[in-house]
Structures are given as structure tokens and as C-alpha cells.
Amino acid sequence: MTKLLLLIGLPGSGKSTLAAQLLTECPQMQLISTDAIRGQLFGSQATQGPWFLIWQEVERQFQQASIANIPTIFDATNAQRRNRREVIELARHTGFTHITGIWVRTPVWLCLTRNKKRDRQVPEDVILRMHRQL
């Protein structure tokens, strides 16, 4: 029984903070983060890069975690319904049997405020668009 926690939320909502807290409480879990993957592939988490390369690495890490039966956290915005469906489909295909979505529902004004304090800022119009999609 391999479990996946699918984090959902705006940039600045606290998804990565929640993931870090979960890993502290449950160190046997694995974190798969699209930001970390961007850092590995492109040298910077801020570099968007070709999505297909990021997705290939997500697939690889999902497969490894599922084969090893490691409970996993997937940290990405997952703002669009179709993106969440793709992640759930991939998770099932790679062997995850229990998939739980956790919506980190933070007020958009707070996400925008936090975003302004970050080194790696997401454009405000992008956050507002994601907010409408959620």
C-alpha cells in the first residue's frame, strides 16, 4: 500500500513549509518537488525550463518511490484540474494505491504578500490566474 500526498495551492501558500514539517514528523517519507527538480535540471529553481523534462523526472521519482513502497509527498502548485488528473493518473500507473490531495488554502492576499518577500517571485497576474483556476 503505497501512499501519495498531493499538495495543492498557490505559490506562497505554504506547501513547501507543510512538506518540510511532514518530513520532520515522518522522516521515512520522500519528497518529490518540481522546484527541486528544476534546480537539479536547470541549475536554478527559478528556471521554468521545458515541462516535459521536469515531468520525465517526476515520473522517474514516482516509479522509484512506488517500487520501494515509500510514502511520498508531491510538492507542486497543481492549480489546474487537468494537471491534478495527470498527476493522479501517473501515481496510479506507477503503483500508488492511496492518493490524498491536500489543498493548502491560504488567502490570495497573503500568498501575494509572501511572494513579494521571496527571492524567486512569481508574477502577480500568474498567481491571480492560478487562484481563479483553483
Predicted regions and their residues:
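Conserved beta-strand scaffold positions in the cores of enzyme catalytic domains, especially
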Residues: 31, 99-101
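Flexible, glycine- and charge-enriched loops at secondary-structure boundaries
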Residues: 48-55, 77, 120, 124-127
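Aromatic/hydrophobic pocket-lining residues that form π-stacking "cages" and hydrophobic walls in ligand
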Residues: 61, 87-89
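Short, surface-exposed connector motifs at secondary-structure boundaries
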Residues: 67-73, 94-96
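Conserved GTP-binding G-domain of TRAFAC-class P-loop NTPases and closely related GTPase folds
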Residues: 1-8, 13-16, 21, 25, ...
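Acidic, metal-coordinating catalytic cores used for nucleic-acid/nucleotide bond scission
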Residues: 75-87
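Short catalytic-loop micro-motif centered on adjacent basic/acidic residues
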Residues: 72-76, 101
